[in-house]
Amino acid sequence: MSDYYGGAHTTVRLIDLATRMPRVLADTPVIVRGAMTGLLARPNSKASIGTVFQDRAARYGDRVFLKFGDQQLTYRDANATANRYAAVLAARGVGPGDVVGIMLRNSPSTVLAMLATVKCGAIAGMLNYHQRGEVLAHSLGLLDAKVLIAESDLVSAVAECGASRGRVAGDVLTVEDVERFATTAPATNPASASAVQAKDTAFYIFTSGTTGFPKASVMTHHRWLRALAVFGGMGLRLKGSDTLYSCLPLYHNNALTVAVSSVINSGATLALGKSFSASRFWDEVIANRATAFVYIGEICRYLLNQPAKPTDRAHQVRVICGNGLRPEIWDEFTTRFGVARVCEFYAASEGNSAFINIFNVPRTAGVSPMPLAFVEYDLDTGDPLRDASGRVRRVPDGEPGLLLSRVNRLQPFDGYTDPVASEKKLVRNAFRDGDCWFNTGDVMSPQGMGHAAFVDRLGDTFRWKGENVATTQVEAALASDQTVEECTVYGVQIPRTGGRAGMAAITLRAGAEFDGQALARTVYGHLPGYALPLFVRVVGSLAHTTTFKSRKVELRNQAYGADIEDPLYVLAGPDEGYVPYYAEYPEEVSLGRRPQG
């Protein structure tokens, strides 16, 4: 395997897969179980999350399904409680196609409320419990829920956001209300669960909303069951004796779909954490005797940034699954913490395809068997470029390109609740009349043997000196500097220049001081000239979404200038390094005088 830019690219060869195949074949029973459950389900079949869970409860009734602190719930008890919850919802008029808003923090009740909702044939609208004000009102408006189940201390946020009770929030129940009403409700499997078809909608999952109001993406039972087969059966390949730890919020698909489906596939245990804490993470993993965990975003980097402890390897984890383990820290992470297998994947809540690292190849998002295309794109619009005949242009073999995913009967695009927003994501008549493709908005780099690596979001990539700059590449270079704890990169405009110049916001490690010459040596040693960040802003902390993605929009809008209160530096050249910002610098860049060398 060959690498460049600190491991950002790996060439996958046949020998790499052949040497890893025996390990995959050893897990054939788990793979087959997932395939039988998920891949054989057809959209019109009577297969659903509720019926699959009922099947597992009948098979594995005495196994522990959920752990949360000192609480434990078996598959049998969880199914009975979910049935009682479903009866409570049905008594309030919830039926097929209705929406139940769920605004709950991580706990067994959240999983049970989801199961109860889908057993009714209804749709679980998984709300981000951090939302307030206009954003919460917007999300509630999209759901138009018949019933809203909320934490008792979050009910006031619903009232204060201005949502109309009857139109937007429906019948508001606290989780304590549901539990109280459920004590006298029937525990038998509801008939409504058997009437649900795989093509029916199971969840609404909200996008992170980094560039505006969140959109509600649609997750059908069919797609969730396919996720069970892919992530649970082919990816994690858990055994019934395994415990999967997840501290990710259950309103996110990595928890609700990847973690929950993988556990249910094998009759394994899901250990829920209240929230992510870098300092407590391994202690909680050890306390739960977890053998696997799910991650997202920068979680792995946060764990690496913690001081080394004797407990770093005092765990039983053998496999982890998620997206966002950066290539530049992959080897350091797996070596320090003794993680034998990384099931990195690429997917999107609204997407219709996925890559998954089945073979444990380092520094890759894995393989996808789906019909895909890597194409040329317009950086300003995010749209694929078309040739003189109006057809989309594929990139040369091995070159990074915008990822398109074919939309067809076997690979449908469920989209958003907003049909206009859904249509904007589709590319029609791309390669021939009548075809249809989903525009992922992501640049991916093919690696061979069906594998690919994530490069950047199109909204983050910028163009400078006629070249496309991937922010992930620049962030990897900056992060290799020993003083940098965390960073995010974005493009900013400079008058009388084309494109956008690179700017970074960084946080420093505890006790470290900014060294402009040393940082310049780092970036010059790792990056081509057009990718060098010209501005560096030293901040106390970086804002993130609740799923650990950097919020760049505000930083990009603030850009640079004398009104920035944080320490701000500019790149003078390879010898002078980064020096304090001065007002003439942007003009010097436009005239080609800076950076020198």
UniProtKB/Swiss-Prot annotation:
GO molecular function, one term: ATP binding
Consequence of gene disruption: Deletion mutant displays a diminished ability to synthesize acyl-coenzyme A in cell-free extracts. Deletion of the gene results in a significant decrease in the accumulation of intracellular triacylglycerol (TAG) in Mycobacterium under dormancy-inducing conditions in vitro.
Gene Ontology cellular-component terms listed: plasma membrane
Gene3D superfamilies named among the record's database cross-references: 3.30.300.30, N-terminal domain of ligase-like
Transmembrane segments: none
Any GO BP annotation: long-chain fatty acid import into cell
Keywords: ATP-binding, Fatty acid metabolism, Ligase, Lipid metabolism, Nucleotide-binding
Highest taxon, organism lineage: Bacteria
Enzyme Commission code(s) on record: 6.2.1.2, 6.2.1.3
InterPro entries: AMP-bd_C, AMP-bd_C_sf, AMP-binding_CS, AMP-dep_synth/lig_dom, ANL_N_sf, FACL_FadD6
CDD domains according to UniProt: FATP_FACS
Catalytic activity, reaction form: a medium-chain fatty acid + ATP + CoA = a medium-chain fatty acyl-CoA + AMP + diphosphate; a long-chain fatty acid + ATP + CoA = a long-chain fatty acyl-CoA + AMP + diphosphate; hexanoate + ATP + CoA = hexanoyl-CoA + AMP + diphosphate; octanoate + ATP + CoA = octanoyl-CoA + AMP + diphosphate
Pfam families assigned: AMP-binding, AMP-binding_C
Induction: Expression is significantly increased during in vitro dormancy (at protein level).
SUPFAM superfamilies associated with the record: Acetyl-CoA synthetase-like (SSF56801)
Function comment: Catalyzes the activation of medium/long-chain fatty acids as acyl-coenzyme A (acyl-CoA). May play a role in the uptake of fatty acids by trapping them metabolically as CoA esters. May also play an important role in the channeling of fatty acids into triacylglycerol (TAG) for use by Mycobacterium during its dormancy.
Entry's family note: Belongs to the ATP-dependent AMP-binding enzyme family.
Misc remark: Stimulates fatty acid uptake in E.coli cells.
The protein, known as: Medium/long-chain-fatty-acid--CoA ligase FadD6
